[in-house]
Amino acid sequence: MEIILLNKVANLGGLGDNVTVKSGYARNFLFPQGQAVPATKANVEKFEARRAELEAKIAEQLAAAEARAAKVAELAEVTIASPAGDEGKLFGSVGTRDIALAITAAGVEIAKSEVKLPTGTLRETGEFEIDLQLHSEVTATIKLVIIQEA
């Protein structure tokens, strides 16, 4: 099925690209999320008329993500206090939700889906480098310190 992408889609293309995808992927995922439209003659003409508006919107989202990345870079570190045993093993774990809440409390709005933990939840005290995927093109790193709760 021929479609026109309305924004950047991983492993497919960018704004305005005419691509061929399986019809189920288009109907069940891309169309409902507003990421694509069928490549009919009428839709191609409509898209060309709105291209500048869509490009400006994408540039605005990218600029906002870069501004948030700069704010994250200004934060030296974020500290989370969690109950732990004598050897530094946590009673429970620190996950993406906890990290997002701690960064938001420090002054930078972060969603839990933007926090990337490739090794899973953190289960011990110490210092960790946490990657944040703020936009498809913008990533940031923040230092997270987990301390034993008094």
Curated annotation (Swiss-Prot):
Q: List the top taxonomic levels of the source.
A: Bacteria, Pseudomonadati, Pseudomonadota, Gammaproteobacteria, Alteromonadales
Family classification: Belongs to the bacterial ribosomal protein bL9 family.
Its Gene Ontology cellular component terms are: ribonucleoprotein complex; ribosome
List the InterPro entries hit by this protein, alphabetically: Ribosomal_bL9, Ribosomal_bL9/RNase_H1_N, Ribosomal_bL9_bac/chp, Ribosomal_bL9_C, Ribosomal_bL9_C_sf, Ribosomal_bL9_N, Ribosomal_bL9_N_sf
Query: What's one GO BP annotation on this UniProt entry?
Result: translation
Q: Give GO MF terms, alphabetically.
A: rRNA binding; structural constituent of ribosome
Entry function:
Binds to the 23S rRNA.
Its recorded name reads Large ribosomal subunit protein bL9
Tell me, what's a Pfam family for it?
Ribosomal_L9_C
Which HAMAP family does this entry report, sorted A to Z?
Ribosomal_bL9
- The superkingdom of the source organism is Bacteria
Sorted alphabetically, which keywords does the UniProt record give? Ribonucleoprotein, Ribosomal protein, RNA-binding, rRNA-binding
